[in-house]
Each structure stands twice: as C-alpha cells, then as structure tokens.
C-alpha cells in the first residue's frame, strides 16, 4: 500500500494529513499504530483524514485518530492544520469553512496574519455529557488516585477533559498522574488531562497528557477546556493566552451557552509517501 500524506504541525502538536475527498481511504488500527511510530513509521500525535461532507450543512468531514488507532471527536490544533491544508491544496476557496468531526461541527477561518481561528463549540459541564461519574455538577471534584486526592474540573469540548489547577507544573507529575487519570474509572471514555498554572487572569501555562497518545507539546481542545474551567470559577477573563511547550494559543470565551474560539498557527512540514 502507498499512501500520500502531508506532515503538519500546530504549536508542536504534529499530524499526518491525508486527502480522501476523491478516493475513499481506510487504515486498520495496526496500520495507524505502525505509521505513528516515530522510529519505524512517519510519527505523529494524530492522523487526520479529510473526507467529503456528510450533509449539505458542512463543507468537509474530517476524522481524527490517536497514535494508538482510536478515533476521537475533536482536535483543535488539527482543525487549524485542516484549514491550511484545504486552502493550500485548493480544495475550497471559501473564506470560512464548516467541517464536521465524529461528534462536532467546527467553524474555521484563516486570519490575514496566517493564523487560523476555530469555533470549537459550547463547553458542556454536565457529568453525563462528558461522560464523568459524579453525583452532581460542581466547579471542581475530588478524585482518589492511588494514595492521593486530586482536585480537578471537568468539561467536554468535543472530547472529555480533566483540568487540574496547580501552583507550579511538575513534568514528572504530568507523565505519571496524567497517565493514570486519562484512564481513570470516573471517565468511562477516558480523558485528556491538563495541568493548569494561572499566571494572571489573562495568561496561563498548560501541559497536557492526551488519552491514547501521551504528553504532547500542545493540545488545542484542552487549552479551550482549561480556559472554560478557569472562567467558570472566576479565575480568568474572556481572552486568555495559553502557553504550552510547543507555543501559545489565544482562547476567547464569553461565557455559558457561547462557543469557545481558539486562534493559533498551523504549518506544513513536509509531504511524502508511506509504504506499507
């Protein structure tokens, strides 16, 4: 099998993008895992597959696969790369695009400076919508993990997210606690786990352990989740700059019942062929 692909990155979150708008495309879980391997494959955090629209209300559909082959419903950094790919490959001349994923519809717009803005949808805090096992709705929950109690906020923005407020981000804790929480029994579908350090009401630092992938240099949807959780409990303002190891994103959220908007860069790294 020969697969033409484009390698892209958004804030260091890297992707393999495949155009399946004209020819149907399918990989098995084992093939995705092989392609994701950074020593024996191409290497990526997520695989993005662009497909024709499922209905007339959107311009394209795109599928998102983690490095372990699991399909997920949201990827903010990937959405920005999709917008740049569609423009570069002349798949559409629209200034604004609507694209569907497994469970969301996103609105994409390339800004004059080349950055891409994505309307990520309305944050959902009800435990049953995340899903998260809890007796009621709260700003923060106390979760038992091994021999400690962890305070976290939860929200769904296309994917389940757990946000842990910390005074200072500890790299070892991100790897160990993040891995444990990403598959915790309180999250029936797993979760992306963000460690949020509030610098001031307009700036936070964030590191993320993604389910099915591990720690990444950036996670757009978790950046949105962190701002939503921080705004909900009065820690943050409407516009927040989120600094992650791979770069910074600007997140805007006016409040309940309104969508979160994320703005940041997206870059093509190289094009190639994968032979299996």
UniProtKB/Swiss-Prot annotation:
Signal peptide interval: none
GO cellular component terms, semicolon-separated: cytosol
Residues the record marks as site: Could be important to modulate the pK values of the two catalytic cysteine residues: 161, 210
Gene3D superfamilies given in the database record: Diaminopimelate Epimerase, Chain A, domain 1 (3.10.310.10)
Pfam families linked: DAP_epimerase
GO molecular function: diaminopimelate epimerase activity
Active site: 75 (proton donor), 219 (proton acceptor)
Biological process terms in GO annotation: lysine biosynthetic process via diaminopimelate
Positions contributing to substrate binding: 13, 46, 66, 76-77, 159, 192, 210-211, 220-221
Subcellular location: Cytoplasm
EC code(s) of this entry: 5.1.1.7
Reaction it catalyzes: (2S,6S)-2,6-diaminopimelate = meso-2,6-diaminopimelate
Main localisation: cytoplasm
InterPro entries: DAP_epimerase_AS, DAP_epimerase_DapF
Keyword vocabulary terms for this entry: Amino-acid biosynthesis, Cytoplasm, Isomerase, Lysine biosynthesis
SUPFAM superfamilies: Diaminopimelate epimerase-like
Site entry: Important for dimerization: 270
Pathway(s) the chain acts in: Amino-acid biosynthesis; L-lysine biosynthesis via DAP pathway; DL-2,6-diaminopimelate from LL-2,6-diaminopimelate: step 1/1
Family: Belongs to the diaminopimelate epimerase family.
HAMAP family the UniProt entry points to: DAP_epimerase
Function (record text): Catalyzes the stereoinversion of LL-2,6-diaminopimelate (L,L-DAP) to meso-diaminopimelate (meso-DAP), a precursor of L-lysine and an essential component of the bacterial peptidoglycan.
Subunit structure: Homodimer.
Record protein name field: Diaminopimelate epimerase
Organism name: Coxiella burnetii (strain RSA 493 / Nine Mile phase I)
Encoding gene (name): dapF
């Amino acid at each position: 099998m020969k697969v033409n692909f484009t390698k892209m990155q958004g804030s260091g979150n890297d992707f393999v993008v495949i155009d399946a708008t004209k020819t149907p495309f399918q990989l098995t879980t084992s093939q995705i895992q092989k392609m994701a391997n950074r020593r024996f494959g191409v290497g990526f955090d997520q695989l993005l597959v662009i497909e024709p629209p499922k209905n007339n209300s959107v311009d394209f559909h795109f599928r998102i696969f983690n490095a372990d082959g699991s399909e997920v419903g949201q990827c903010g950094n990937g959405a920005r790369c999709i917008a740049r790919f569609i423009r570069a490959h002349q798949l559409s001349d629209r200034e604004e695009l609507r694209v569907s994923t497994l469970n969301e519809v996103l609105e994409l717009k390339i800004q004059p400076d080349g950055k891409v803005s994505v309307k990520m949808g309305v944050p959902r805090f009800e435990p049953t919508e995340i899903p998260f096992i809890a007796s009621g709705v709260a700003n923060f929950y106390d979760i038992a993990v091994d021999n400690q109690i962890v305070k976290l906020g939860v929200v769904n923005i296309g994917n389940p997210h757990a946000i842990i407020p910390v005074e200072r981000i500890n790299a070892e804790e991100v790897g160990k606690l993040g891995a444990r929480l990403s598959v915790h029994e309180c999250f029936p579908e797993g979760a992306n786990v963000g460690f949020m350090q509030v610098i001031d009401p307009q700036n936070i630092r964030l590191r993320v352990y993604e389910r099915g992938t591990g720690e990444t240099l950036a996670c757009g949807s978790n950046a949105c989740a962190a701002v939503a959780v921080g705004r909900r409990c009065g820690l943050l303002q409407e516009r927040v700059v989120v600094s992650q190891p791979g770069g910074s994103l600007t997140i805007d959220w006016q409040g309940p019942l309104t969508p979160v908007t994320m703005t940041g860069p997206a870059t093509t790294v190289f094009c190639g062929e994968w032979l299996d």
